[in-house]
C-alpha cells in the first residue's frame, strides 16, 4: 500500500500536550533506584503528529509549551520532523511539562508527572490558530487537555471549529489517571466529548476502565458505541486490535517483536491509521481495505515498541512494510 506523497495528502492536525519524558537508563527499577535518566520528547498528540510525517503524511501540532529551553527544544523537534508548528504558543510564566517514566522489566510503564501548572494546561481559546484548525481534514486529540481550565475551553473550541469546517474527529483518550483529581472525574470528562468523535481508539485497559467490566469482548466494546461513530478501535497490545463499525466488526492480529519500551505504540498505531484514511474515508466502510490499513497500523505500533522512547522509534512506511512482509 503506497503512502500518499506529503504534497498531496490532507492535513492532520493534532491538539494537546507535548512534554519531556525522563526515562531511566535501567529497566525494571523504581524511580528512586534509577541510576540516571535520558530525556525523551513525548506527549501523545505530538507523537501522533510525528508518526504521520514519518509515514509521509502532513501534520500540524496545536498546543502550548513553556518559553524555556525544553519548550523550544520540543518545538524544534516538531519542525525537524516536518510537523507544521504555527499552532504552537509559548507561555512565559509556566514551564514545559515533565514526566518521569518507570520502565518495568516487560517494557510497560508507570508515570510521575511535574505539571502544576505546566504550560500546556494554560492554552486559552483566544490563542488558538483557528485558520490552521479549519484547514484540517482530520482533527486528533486526547483527554489530558480536558483536565483543567483554560485548556479545556480551548479544547472544546478547537473541536467545534474543526467539526464545523468538516474535519473527521479522531479521539484517543490516552488515560493517565495520576493527572486526574479522581477516577470518577476522569471517566466523566473522557465521556463528556465522546459523542463528537468520528473515530475512537481505546486500549484494552481503557475499555475496562470506561465500562467498569473486566471483559475485553464485543459486548463491552459496543457499550461505548454512539450513533455518529464511524470506527471504534480497541487495541490489544501484541495481540493486535478489534474494530467495530456500523456494518461489521472483527479482529486484526498483531506482531511478535522483542518489546523494549511500549511508549508511543498506540500513538504510532493512530498516526498510521489517520495517514491512510485522511484522503480516502471510504476505507472506513470497506472491511477488506480497513483490515489492510489496520494491519499496517499494528505493524507501526509493534515496531515502536522495539526501541526506547516514542519519537525515535516511530517507523517509516518502508520499515512497516518490511515487517508486514515478514522480513523483520
From Swiss-Prot:
A GO cellular component annotation in the UniProt record: cytosol
A GO term for molecular function: fructokinase activity
Sorted UniProt keywords: ATP-binding, Carbohydrate metabolism, Kinase, Nucleotide-binding, Transferase
Catalytic activity: D-fructose + ATP = D-fructose 6-phosphate + ADP + H(+)
Pfam family, any one: PfkB
GO process terms (BP): fructose metabolic process; starch biosynthetic process
EC number: 2.7.1.4
Lineage top rank: taxon: Eukaryota
InterPro entries per UniProt: Carboh/pur_kinase_PfkB_CS (IPR002173), PfkB_Carbo_kinase (IPR050306), PfkB_dom (IPR011611), Ribo/fructo_kinase (IPR002139), Ribokinase-like (IPR029056)
Top-rank EC class of the record's enzyme: transferase
Pathway membership: Glycan biosynthesis; starch biosynthesis
Function per UniProt: May play an important role in maintaining the flux of carbon towards starch formation.
Family: Belongs to the carbohydrate kinase PfkB family.
The protein's name: Fructokinase-2
Species this protein is from: Solanum habrochaites
Lineage: Eukaryota, Viridiplantae, Streptophyta, Embryophyta, Tracheophyta
Amino acid at each position: 500500500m503506497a503512502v500518499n506523497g506529503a504534497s498531496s495528502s490532507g492535513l492532520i492536525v493534532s491538539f494537546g500536550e507535548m512534554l519531556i519524558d525522563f526515562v531511566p537508563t535501567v529497566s525494571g527499577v523504581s524511580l528512586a533506584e534509577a541510576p540516571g535518566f535520558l530525556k525523551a520528547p513525548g506527549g501523545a498528540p505530538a507523537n501522533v503528529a510525528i508518526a504521520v510525517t514519518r509515514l509521509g503524511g502532513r501534520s500540524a501540532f496545536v498546543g502550548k509549551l513553556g518559553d524555556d529551553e525544553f519548550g523550544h527544544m520540543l518545538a524544534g523537534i516538531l519542525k525537524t520532523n516536518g510537523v507544521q508548528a504555527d499552532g504552537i504558543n509559548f507561555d512565559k510564566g509556566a514551564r514545559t511539562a515533565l514526566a518521569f517514566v518507570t520502565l518495568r522489566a516487560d517494557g510497560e510503564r508507570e508515570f510521575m508527572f511535574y505539571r502544576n501548572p505546566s504550560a500546556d494546561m494554560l492554552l486559552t481559546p483566544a490563542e488558538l490558530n483557528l485558520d490552521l484548525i479549519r484547514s484540517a481534514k482530520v482533527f486528533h486529540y486526547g483527554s489530558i487537555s480536558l483536565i483543567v481550565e483554560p485548556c479545556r475551553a480551548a479544547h472544546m473550541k478547537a473541536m467545534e471549529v474543526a467539526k464545523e469546517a468538516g474535519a473527521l474527529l479522531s479521539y484517543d483518550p490516552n488515560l493517565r489517571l495520576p493527572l486526574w483529581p479522581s477516577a470518577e472525574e476522569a471517566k466523566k470528562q473522557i465521556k463528556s466529548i465522546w459523542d463528537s468523535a468520528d473515530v475512537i481508539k481505546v486500549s484494552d485497559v481503557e475499555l475496562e476502565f470506561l465500562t467498569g467490566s473486566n471483559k475485553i469482548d464485543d459486548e463491552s466494546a459496543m457499550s461505548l458505541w454512539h450513533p455518529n461513530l464511524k470506527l471504534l478501535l480497541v487495541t490489544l497490545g501484541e495481540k493486535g486490535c478489534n474494530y467495530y463499525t456500523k456494518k461489521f466488526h472483527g479482529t486484526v492480529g498483531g506482531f511478535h517483536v522483542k518489546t523494549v519500551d511500549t511508549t508511543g505504540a498506540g500513538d504510532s498505531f493512530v498516526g498510521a491509521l489517520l495517514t491512510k484514511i485522511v484522503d480516502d474515508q471510504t476505507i472506513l466502510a470497506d472491511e477488506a481495505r480497513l483490515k489492510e490499513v489496520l494491519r499496517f497500523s499494528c505493524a507501526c505500533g509493534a515496531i515502536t515498541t522495539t526501541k526506547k522512547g516514542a519519537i525515535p522509534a516511530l517507523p517509516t512506511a518502508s520499515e512497516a512494510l518490511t515487517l508486514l512482509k515478514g522480513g523483520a
